[in-house]
């Protein structure tokens, strides 16, 4: 397992990431993976002897004594099944795990293969990249579950219609003479039961509509609201895919690029090891690697996955990449896009009713605008963003399980978010309250994944995966960051002392004229 490395002093304001092994001073880390229909990919790094924290002097530093070589090869030709009677405990995602092929005695195949360039290279991040890391999310903030284009078009039209109707009702009421207003009030009092019955019928129809459009996920067992048909949503997904392809058409890596092959290899391995999971085999998975410093990755409902090279430079090993790609697979398999679209449409419909009431009741347009702004913010921060965080947490949970079934070191998932949190703290970035974000905070993600890892380790054992190496990479990361901070403090202290020494006053030596010395001697 690898982690953050090559960190320079905080005074330099640079952070470096690279694939490297958790070895002592000079080690080799070979991560190989194979799957049907994919080329074999190996990530191989030679780590130079540690000579300090400078980039030109070292590639990484760690604290493991002795020699350590880690080889990992995934075999996709695993057959057979292992029944599980604890489907509820493994999140109802599968009832069987594929096991190692008997031809290989169910042992991890150890061999070295031709190396390809790594997914990430050691490089200093620019200020723009640092800002991107701070805002990093595995899926775009508002496109993790993309809203269909039709709903995006209808939303402003619905809002405008509600404002016009509400304002029209207010103007009509204000224009009525007092006697007419009394007549209207009297009619309302006489027909209050009819109005109550009408509103109750509307509410009942709404409840019936809601429950008849619920669908239970076969993976999580959770009910979700689906308002659009699968065919309609497929067409909308194709439109969105074409829009993304048009935007990135000049930045796509070729299929022969080493980074593309590496991502494809990991994705193919995840799909192969989880083909028994409902929905995965029904999706045609296609990978697109975009040459861009943007640190992001997202998947469309039709299985089109977009990964940016900036994202690849931010992960430190295959295990982290497996978890993050599993997270994106989970978004697509769980139907988060369709679910988010249905929930947004429902909230917009209810919001349109409240908006009409606001513009009808408020006596002035300025007050109505203020109430409308408050209503939109309440909807955003009390419903939309919490719901988005819920979907992200669910994708983390299922993505962790998919990575566990693929025999990845799932402890790396927690390390990744610790890295993101460390970058924020290293640059003094203030922590934004989680309720303001569409994604869980890095720290909360670390805690959540750490709670899930023991269960995922059991699933990994059920799938006859090879045992994980010790020590725990989470512990190593904490030791590394602690050591780095101590070294940074020492370096900053030395710089401070040097500055103080440079600023000390130096006594000026007066030049005594030679004639003065001669006169003094002759006089004596």
From Swiss-Prot:
Assigned GO CC terms: mitochondrial inner membrane; mitochondrial intermembrane space; mitochondrial membrane; mitochondrion
Regulation: Protease activity is activated upon autocatalytic cleavage in response to mitochondrial depolarization.
Keyword Transcription regulation: no
Mitochondrial matrix side: 144-195
Domain-level remarks: The stress-sensor region regulates proteolysis and activation.
Annotated family: Belongs to the peptidase M48 family.
Protein name: Metalloendopeptidase OMA1, mitochondrial
Gene expressing this chain: OMA1
